[in-house]
């Protein structure tokens, strides 16, 4: 018993150590779990520790019971030995044997109780082991779920890291662009200041030029005035000269003119002599002053003054050259500014024309789209009007009355049960097909059958030996259908049929493909990540709500997806179907791990109005 107790105690201690190891290892896993998972893990760990403590207490109680049993067995052996001694020492029975028997019975009762408690404890241990296994399975499921979520979490973290990297890159680019904008603004401010300074200088030069122009105009006016006065005087003198045409008058005029010339020459010579004398006197006076100053002034000072005068002259010349160069530069700058202004005005006018052209093009596109919509609405309205006209004429309402008597009217319906009369009212919708036949159509009760064609119209059937006849209340149905068939079919055929496109080409990766489609919606591209549909029309918007994409490999369907919401594609717009791992990237996805773009794969497109007619397909040739 002691060996079993030691083995049991060591076993449960080992299990407690293992559970502690699991708990510590699981505690390390808690750091990467969510709050709910961490709470659940903590509760499981507390329950395991509580169970471990209870198992330890039960082991201690079992060991105590075993020790008590061993002690009682030892006492039993001692008492048995004493009983044997007493029995051998005394003859016959006495009261001592009764006492010993009572003690033995009491010890047996205690032993039985201990054995009964042991079985109870073993059952408790078995139940706790089952619960431990259940909790262990739950724990393993939780660990697997955590690992699966951790993989998704890693994928999300990678995507988040890429997005954050792109955001940081865009922010850095924005900062660089902002710095460039600030630098360009500073340069623009400097250029504007330089332009303002040049404009001010230009304004000053223009003002000076205007002033000089005014002075020149004044001088020209004075010259013109003097010239006019002189011309008037000459004209007056010429008048007198023309009057005096005699030789004496000419001689007199000549002598007077010569005398006047001599007087003018004498006056000029006198003035010249007087001016020359005055200049000579002034020159001599200046020479005398210079000589006197040269005697008084130091030659070094004279040299310095001469150098300063030369320097001043040089500076004046350099300034004059600088002014001339600046004037030339300003003239060139004015010409450049004029050219730039003209070019800017031309670009502005050209941009306005382009904007007007783009606006007109958009308006034309919108008008074309509206016109197409109006045409479609007109066609549908015509069809509806014709349909309502047919309904009003009563050409599609037929009432059948069945009885036990037969009458040949070209229309026969089988169906008499027990001599009763049935009235069948049937409404048929007119289609574009010329003859529509219905045969072997089961009725609502077993044994009834209707056969015939709508165009004739003959419907017949039998039940046992009873016959039936029917009468059409709307007149001759065949003629009514024939009368309106042409107009309805003409309205339906007026709608243009979808154009068939059969294209072969090379995609961006260099692979050859073969694409076939009806209308304007095509399968533009198939990659392992997505399938792309495109509206190839440049002016028309198309509704793709209800379109279904299906991909098959060697005739076996790999997967399918449908657009279950109204969706209108603008001209040249695309829509993509992603796989299940990329369902967060778009609105539509297919429940596949990846799309097959090999040569054995075929991608097809269907419309909800014609679910079995293939509207488009796409395959790779290599």
UniProtKB/Swiss-Prot annotation:
Keywords: Coiled coil, Cytoplasm, Intermediate filament. Residues 19-54 are annotated as: Head. The gene is ifc-2. Coiled coil: none annotated. The lineage of its organism: Eukaryota, Metazoa, Ecdysozoa, Nematoda, Chromadorea. Residues 400-550 are annotated as: Tail. Cytoplasmic intermediate filaments provide mechanical strength to cells. Not essential protein, although its absence leads to mild defects in locomotion. This is Intermediate filament protein ifc-2. Residues 256-399 are annotated as: Coil 2. Transmembrane segments: none annotated. Expressed in intestinal cells and at desmosomes in intestine and pharynx of the larva.
């Amino acid at each position: 018993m002691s060996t079993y107790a030691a083995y049991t105690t060591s076993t449960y201690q080992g299990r407690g150590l293992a559970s502690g190891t699991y708990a510590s290892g699981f505690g390390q896993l808690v750091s990467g779990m969510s709050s709910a998972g961490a709470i659940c893990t903590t509760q499981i760990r507390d329950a395991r520790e509580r169970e471990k403590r209870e198992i330890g207490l039960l082991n201690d109680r079992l060991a105590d019971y075993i020790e008590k049993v061993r002690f009682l067995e030892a006492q039993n052996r001692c008492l048995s030995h004493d009983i044997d001694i007493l029995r051998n020492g005394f003859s016959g029975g006495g009261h001592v044997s009764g006492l010993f028997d009572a003690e033995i019975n009491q010890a047996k009762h205690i032993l039985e109780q201990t054995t009964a408690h042991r079985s109870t404890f073993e059952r408790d241990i078995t139940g706790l082991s089952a619960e431990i296994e259940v909790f262990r399975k739950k724990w393993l499921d939780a660990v697997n779920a955590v690992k699966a979520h951790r993989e998704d979490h890693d994928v999300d973290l990678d995507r988040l890291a890429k997005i954050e990297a792109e955001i940081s890159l865009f922010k850095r680019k924005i900062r660089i662009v902002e710095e460039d904008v600030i630098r360009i603004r500073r340069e623009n401010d400097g250029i504007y200041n330089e332009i303002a300074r040049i404009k001010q200088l230009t304004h000053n030069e223009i003002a000076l030029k205007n002033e000089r122009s005014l002075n020149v105009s004044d001088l020209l006016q004075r010259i013109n005035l003097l010239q006019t006065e002189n011309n008037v005087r000459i004209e007056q003198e010429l008048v007198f000269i023309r009057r005096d045409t005699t030789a004496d008058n000419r001689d007199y005029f000549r002598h007077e003119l010569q005398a006047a010339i001599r007087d003018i020459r004498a006056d000029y010579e006198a003035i010249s002599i007087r001016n020359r004398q005055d200049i000579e006197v002034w020159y001599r006076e200046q020479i005398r002053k210079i000589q006197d100053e040269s005697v008084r002034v130091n030659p070094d000072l004279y040299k310095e003054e001469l150098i300063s005068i030369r320097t001043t002259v040089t500076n004046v010349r350099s300034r004059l050259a600088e002014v001339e160069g600046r004037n030339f530069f300003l003239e060139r700058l004015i010409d450049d500014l004029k050219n730039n202004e003209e070019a800017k005005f031309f670009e502005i006018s050209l941009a306005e024309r382009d904007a007007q052209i783009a606006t007109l093009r958009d308006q034309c596109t919108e008008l074309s789209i509206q016109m197409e919509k109006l045409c479609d609405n007109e066609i549908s309205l015509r069809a509806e009007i014709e349909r309502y006209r047919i309904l009003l004429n009563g050409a599609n309402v037929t009432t059948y009355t069945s009885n036990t008597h037969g009458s040949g009217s070209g229309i026969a319906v089988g169906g008499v049960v027990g001599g009763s009369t049935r009235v069948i009212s049937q409404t048929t919708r007119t289609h574009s097909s010329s003859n529509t036949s219905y045969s072997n159509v089961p009725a609502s009760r077993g044994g009834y059958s209707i056969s015939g064609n709508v165009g004739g119209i003959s419907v017949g059937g039998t039940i046992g030996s009873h016959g039936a006849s029917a009468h059409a209340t709307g007149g001759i149905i065949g003629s009514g259908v024939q009368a309106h068939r042409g107009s309805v079919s003409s309205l339906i055929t007026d709608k243009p049929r979808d154009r068939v496109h059969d294209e072969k080409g090379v995609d961006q990766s260099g692979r050859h493909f073969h694409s076939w489609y009806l209308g304007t919606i095509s399968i533009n591209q198939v990659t392992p990540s997505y399938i792309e549909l495109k509206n190839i029309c440049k002016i028309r918007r198309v509704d793709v709500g209800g379109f279904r994409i299906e991909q098959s490999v060697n005739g076996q369907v790999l997967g399918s997806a449908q657009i279950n919401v109204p969706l209108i594609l603008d001209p040249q717009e695309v829509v993509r179907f992603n796989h299940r791992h990329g369902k967060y990237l778009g609105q539509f996805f297919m429940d596949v791990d990846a799309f097959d773009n090999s040569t054995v794969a075929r991608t097809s497109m269907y419309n909800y109005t014609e679910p079995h007619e293939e509207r488009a397909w796409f395959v790779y040739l290599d």
